[in-house]
Amino acid sequence: MVDAVVSVCLERLVKVLVKEGNVLLGYRDQFQKVQNDLQYMRSFFKDAERLKRKNEVLKCTLADLRELVYEVEDILADCQLLSNSSGKLLHGFSPIKVPAKYQMGKRLGEINVKITSIKDNITSFLGPLSQSLHGNVQEEGPPRWSSPIYDHTQVVGLEGDTRKLKDWLSQADNSGILSIGVVGMGGLGKTTVAQTVFNEKEMELHFEKRIWVSVSQKFTEDQIMRSILRNLGDANIGDDRGDLLKRINQYLLGKRFLIVLDDVWSEDTSWWLRIYEGLPKGSGSCIIVTTRIEKVARKMGVQEARIHRPKVLGEGHSWSLFCNVAFAENHGSCTSTELECVGKEIVSKCRGLPLAIKAVGGMMLCKPPYYHVWRRIADHFREELTDVDDNSVMASLQCSYDELPSYLKSCLLSLSIYPEDCEISKDQLVRWWIGEGFVPVRNGRLATEASEDCFSGLTNRCLVEVVEWDYNGKISTCKVHDMVRDQVIQIAKDESFSGLNAAHRRHLGLTTDIKEKEIVTSKKLRALISTTKSGEVNKIASSIGNKFCDFRYLRVLDLSKSIFEVPLSTLLGKISNLKHLTCFNLSNTHPLTQVPQTLEKLHNLQILDVSYCQSLKSLPPFVMTFENLVVLDVSHCGSLEFLPEGLEKLSNLQVLLGFKPARAEGEGSRISALRSLSQLRILELQLTRADEIDDNETDALTGLIEMQILTISCFNSFESDKLISKLEKVCPPLQLHELSLKFYPGKTSPKWLNPTSLPMLRYLSICGGNLAQLDKSFWGNDETCWKIKGLKLDSLSHLSVKWEMIQRVMPSLRTVHACWSPELISFPIEGVGFRGGVWKEDRNN
């Protein structure tokens, strides 16, 4: 992690040394010395990071260095702030700048002395301690994890396990509720077995109600009952415990149901006995409990004859699972005998544990397919392993962490602040990474693209678990596997990334049960992030707002999904002191009717998110002076009528969501302002009236050659005929990769929706509206056809299209999502007129 922190700092140092030469005059030599020393030490960091787990002196030395690097970053931030705020030279004679100049020189001098001392210590320690690399490392920590989602391609060798559970489930009679236990060590596949059975089509048909409950180590009886009710579709959840259980009984009475209680730890099962007594008996209902503790299963009413204990995978299944992950790009096939030999050696170290196999397979997927590279990792892996099974798993995860690029280490550690079993928004993560500078932006790539790549890097290494996919194959939410989470939390504590030590903590998650003291005493915070679970909200007190001025170097402030006990203008009265703030998230907050004027001085903002604020009526004009904005998200703000004038000034904007152009003769930014946003990659355009587009503005999108994703939404549109006429003239950019039409008012698709006008389109989504037929241009001709891979048709009650026509014009189609569209003809998806489903191409045929 020190490597990660130093890498980010070095990158910023180089930028400042190049761009802020005048500001640094008088201190360039000192900054240059910091840079040289850090670059010298970075060559030792990889070995030092491994050695520190075995040597306390080196561990403390690296911790001291990490703190100093943070201080260097703070000085850099202050330096840039002085330059941006005044435009005057730091060596000038302004009485305001003289104290700042003196303080900066003093701080730099102190830091250089300390860094020199640390450099000497690291150099001296690495020599005598290098041989200890071959010693054993034992990392402890109880793993925890739960998720109802699974990837069937990564289920190998569990056929016998699932068959046994299905046989037991079929034996349930009307005499009571059949209880089944799945018991074993962490990472053995208990949850996967339950997931597979839970998602079987025959189970869906057999049980009228299926309920998945993730039971974490910290839970309450009320939380369990609320989770059951949410599974049953009851969103109106009250507070009375007796009423909760009564409503559960009413929902399940007379129905055959299956309840999975996943990852139960508590040996005090009295909570479950009370819930169990309130469940209706009979009807062939079943309960599956997964746990590591056999005693827990027994106390929850599972008989010995109904306890299943999964075994570790054999060599063949272990290798197959590894290949499915490590050679995913080659359809799970290893074609090199050399790699197969060393690969099987690596797999053998995992000892048949599916979690370890998948994690290591994900790591190898990202490695060059060269024997010497795999040989090196195999040798290192052996050194990390111990003879204790649980510790072997943690060693495999530690190995995956050690092999991460430095920037991905910071990204992975950001997951440490989220509660157990929390579903994490991908957008929240990647925007945080952009705001704090975790993501390296090189070779002309933009921050939004680089951050998406970082997220993909974690998923490819199986370090995060996918909860929900979008139709386009992108991940919208994820979870952290319990074992990964334990390891990440431990590392984050050691590195003061997050943890219990408020004096050094840099990152903190806002949860419903967090104490105010935890926030106000964390004065070194870089990021304060809302980490509430689905359906929960934070209550933000005014006393916390009064402490914002203490978080001098806060970069990321995420107050999403919060309720403010005082007016926001009062709560954020001192937020103008957060001069270094780069990411501010107020999405889904209540009540937010206007953006406070105190934000006006936050000119370093790169990300502003006020989405899902239904009461927000307007954005203040000063937002259009934030020239560093990369992301502006005002989507799903029902009361917001337009954006203020000046949108064209946001030349660095890469993502603009919820843009409502001003009407003719009205105030605000017109659609023509988009012409100036040359870096725009993602645009969501909301159109409701014809006068929001002039005839001379219909080509406003054409010149946006970097745009990849476009959404056009016409929800609650007026003057449909006139608006349709304007929409027909819109010219999306040729290189568009993904298009979404929402609530399109016309009965026929626009003529520009054709394979010639959009030759690069890969994903198409059409949701809602009056569409009844696709224009003849949509079907192309003998020489042109779509290159679309993913198609989504949702809530199109009038659209009549034949499946064979879709197949003909979209030969590259891989996935189709279709629902609530009853006029679709011969689609290979059951219930397309209702909830529908997903069709995926069978590549084996």
Segments from the language model and where they lie:
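N-terminal amphipathic alpha-helical segments
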Residues: 1-57, 646
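Leucine-rich repeat
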Residues: 9, 45, 56, 149, ...
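Charged, amphipathic alpha-helical interaction modules
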Residues: 43-144
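Surface-exposed helical/coil interface segments that assemble multiprotein signaling complexes
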Residues: 75, 80-90, 96-98, 103, ...
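N-terminal flanking helix/linker immediately upstream of nucleotide/cofactor-binding cores
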Residues: 114-188, 192-208, 214-217, 227, ...
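Loop/turn-to-beta-strand initiation segments
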Residues: 255-258, 282-288
